[in-house]
Amino acid sequence: RVQKYVHNLKSKLDAKTKNVKLHILRSDGGLASARSAEDFPVNLLMSGPAGGVTGALWVAVRAGFPNLLTVDVGGTSTDVALINNGQPRLRRETTVGDVTVRASSVDIRTVGAGGGSIAHVPELTGALRVGPQSAGADPGPAAYGKGGVEPTVTDANVVLGYLPEQQKL
Protein backbone atom coordinates (compact mmCIF):
# COMPACT_ATOMS: atom_id res chain seq x y z
CA ARG A 1 0.00 0.00 0.00
CA VAL A 2 2.82 2.42 0.83
CA GLN A 3 4.49 1.58 -2.47
CA LYS A 4 1.31 2.37 -4.40
CA TYR A 5 0.71 5.58 -2.43
CA VAL A 6 4.26 6.86 -2.96
CA HIS A 7 4.16 5.90 -6.64
CA ASN A 8 0.87 7.79 -7.15
CA LEU A 9 2.15 10.81 -5.22
CA LYS A 10 5.33 10.91 -7.30
CA SER A 11 3.34 10.62 -10.52
CA LYS A 12 1.07 13.53 -9.56
CA LEU A 13 4.03 15.68 -8.52
CA ASP A 14 5.94 14.86 -11.71
CA ALA A 15 2.90 15.87 -13.76
CA LYS A 16 2.68 19.25 -12.01
CA THR A 17 6.34 20.18 -11.52
CA LYS A 18 9.69 19.58 -13.14
CA ASN A 19 12.54 17.68 -11.50
CA VAL A 20 10.91 17.27 -8.10
CA LYS A 21 12.76 15.15 -5.56
CA LEU A 22 10.25 13.62 -3.18
CA HIS A 23 11.43 12.88 0.34
CA ILE A 24 9.29 11.41 3.12
CA LEU A 25 9.81 11.77 6.85
CA ARG A 26 11.05 8.64 8.63
CA SER A 27 10.20 7.54 12.16
CA ASP A 28 13.65 8.63 13.34
CA GLY A 29 13.09 12.21 12.13
CA GLY A 30 15.29 11.87 9.05
CA LEU A 31 14.24 11.88 5.41
CA ALA A 32 13.78 8.91 3.11
CA SER A 33 13.88 9.07 -0.66
CA ALA A 34 10.72 7.97 -2.42
CA ARG A 35 12.47 4.75 -3.43
CA SER A 36 13.61 4.03 0.12
CA ALA A 37 10.10 4.71 1.43
CA GLU A 38 8.68 2.25 -1.10
CA ASP A 39 11.28 -0.41 -0.30
CA PHE A 40 11.28 -0.03 3.50
CA PRO A 41 7.88 1.30 4.62
CA VAL A 42 8.50 0.05 8.17
CA ASN A 43 10.80 3.06 8.61
CA LEU A 44 7.79 5.37 8.18
CA LEU A 45 5.67 3.72 10.88
CA MET A 46 5.94 6.56 13.44
CA SER A 47 6.72 9.40 11.04
CA GLY A 48 3.63 11.39 12.07
CA PRO A 49 4.62 11.79 15.72
CA ALA A 50 8.27 12.21 14.67
CA GLY A 51 7.16 15.16 12.54
CA GLY A 52 5.94 17.04 15.61
CA VAL A 53 9.26 16.53 17.36
CA THR A 54 11.26 17.45 14.24
CA GLY A 55 9.23 20.63 13.77
CA ALA A 56 9.65 21.63 17.41
CA LEU A 57 13.39 20.96 17.16
CA TRP A 58 13.72 23.16 14.06
CA VAL A 59 12.06 26.10 15.84
CA ALA A 60 13.82 25.54 19.18
CA VAL A 61 17.36 25.40 17.76
CA ARG A 62 16.82 28.63 15.82
CA ALA A 63 15.45 30.26 18.97
CA GLY A 64 18.51 29.17 20.96
CA PHE A 65 16.92 26.34 22.95
CA PRO A 66 18.81 23.11 22.24
CA ASN A 67 17.32 21.31 25.26
CA LEU A 68 13.60 20.88 25.58
CA LEU A 69 10.63 18.67 26.23
CA THR A 70 8.20 18.63 23.31
CA VAL A 71 4.48 18.19 23.90
CA ASP A 72 2.13 17.51 20.98
CA VAL A 73 -1.51 17.52 22.10
CA GLY A 74 -3.83 15.95 19.56
CA GLY A 75 -7.51 15.20 19.79
CA THR A 76 -7.25 11.87 21.60
CA SER A 77 -3.62 11.59 22.70
CA THR A 78 -0.59 13.59 23.79
CA ASP A 79 2.95 12.81 22.60
CA VAL A 80 5.98 13.82 24.66
CA ALA A 81 9.65 13.66 23.61
CA LEU A 82 12.98 14.84 25.03
CA ILE A 83 15.53 16.81 23.00
CA ASN A 84 19.03 17.10 24.45
CA ASN A 85 21.76 19.23 22.83
CA GLY A 86 19.67 19.61 19.69
CA GLN A 87 19.17 15.85 19.28
CA PRO A 88 15.98 13.91 19.96
CA ARG A 89 16.38 10.66 21.85
CA LEU A 90 16.03 7.63 19.60
CA ARG A 91 14.86 4.07 20.15
CA ARG A 92 16.16 1.05 18.25
CA GLU A 93 12.75 -0.62 18.17
CA THR A 94 9.27 0.66 17.48
CA THR A 95 6.20 -0.77 19.15
CA VAL A 96 2.65 -0.20 17.96
CA GLY A 97 0.05 -2.07 19.95
CA ASP A 98 1.38 -5.59 20.47
CA VAL A 99 3.80 -5.49 17.53
CA THR A 100 7.48 -4.58 17.93
CA VAL A 101 9.71 -4.05 14.90
CA ARG A 102 13.42 -3.31 14.62
CA ALA A 103 13.18 0.14 13.15
CA SER A 104 14.68 3.24 14.75
CA SER A 105 12.28 5.94 15.86
CA VAL A 106 12.23 9.10 17.92
CA ASP A 107 11.65 8.12 21.57
CA ILE A 108 8.12 9.43 22.00
CA ARG A 109 5.89 8.59 24.94
CA THR A 110 2.15 8.77 24.37
CA VAL A 111 -0.71 9.08 26.82
CA GLY A 112 -4.33 8.55 25.86
CA ALA A 113 -5.50 12.04 26.75
CA GLY A 114 -5.82 14.78 24.17
CA GLY A 115 -7.80 17.97 23.73
CA GLY A 116 -11.04 16.12 23.04
CA SER A 117 -10.64 13.61 25.89
CA ILE A 118 -13.56 13.71 28.31
CA ALA A 119 -12.98 14.25 32.03
CA HIS A 120 -15.15 12.14 34.34
CA VAL A 121 -15.35 10.78 37.88
CA PRO A 122 -16.12 7.03 37.97
CA GLU A 123 -18.34 5.90 40.84
CA LEU A 124 -15.97 3.07 41.73
CA THR A 125 -12.94 5.25 42.49
CA GLY A 126 -14.41 8.71 42.94
CA ALA A 127 -11.20 10.07 41.38
CA LEU A 128 -10.96 12.37 38.38
CA ARG A 129 -10.05 10.54 35.18
CA VAL A 130 -9.39 11.80 31.67
CA GLY A 131 -10.21 9.62 28.64
CA PRO A 132 -10.27 7.29 26.91
CA GLN A 133 -13.69 8.60 25.89
CA SER A 134 -13.48 11.50 23.46
CA ALA A 135 -15.86 14.23 22.35
CA GLY A 136 -14.52 13.80 18.84
CA ALA A 137 -14.50 16.62 16.31
CA ASP A 138 -18.29 16.80 16.14
CA PRO A 139 -19.78 17.95 18.41
CA GLY A 140 -16.36 18.30 20.03
CA PRO A 141 -15.54 20.06 23.28
CA ALA A 142 -18.13 22.47 24.70
CA ALA A 143 -15.75 25.33 23.85
CA TYR A 144 -16.34 24.61 20.15
CA GLY A 145 -19.92 25.83 20.54
CA LYS A 146 -21.24 22.95 18.41
CA GLY A 147 -23.36 21.21 21.04
CA GLY A 148 -20.74 19.36 23.08
CA VAL A 149 -21.65 19.27 26.78
CA GLU A 150 -19.18 16.90 28.45
CA PRO A 151 -16.05 18.52 29.95
CA THR A 152 -12.85 17.96 27.96
CA VAL A 153 -9.19 18.88 28.27
CA THR A 154 -9.79 21.73 25.80
CA ASP A 155 -12.64 23.06 27.95
CA ALA A 156 -10.41 22.96 31.04
CA ASN A 157 -7.76 24.96 29.17
CA VAL A 158 -10.36 27.59 28.26
CA VAL A 159 -11.62 27.82 31.86
CA LEU A 160 -8.04 28.09 33.17
CA GLY A 161 -7.28 30.87 30.67
CA TYR A 162 -4.68 28.92 28.69
CA LEU A 163 -6.85 29.15 25.57
CA PRO A 164 -8.81 32.30 24.69
CA GLU A 165 -12.54 32.06 25.35
CA GLN A 166 -13.53 34.49 22.60
CA GLN A 167 -11.49 32.87 19.84
CA LYS A 168 -13.25 30.32 17.69
CA LEU A 169 -11.54 27.02 18.42
Residue ranges and their predicted role:
Residues R1-L169:
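N-terminally biased helix-coil "hinge/interface" segments that flank
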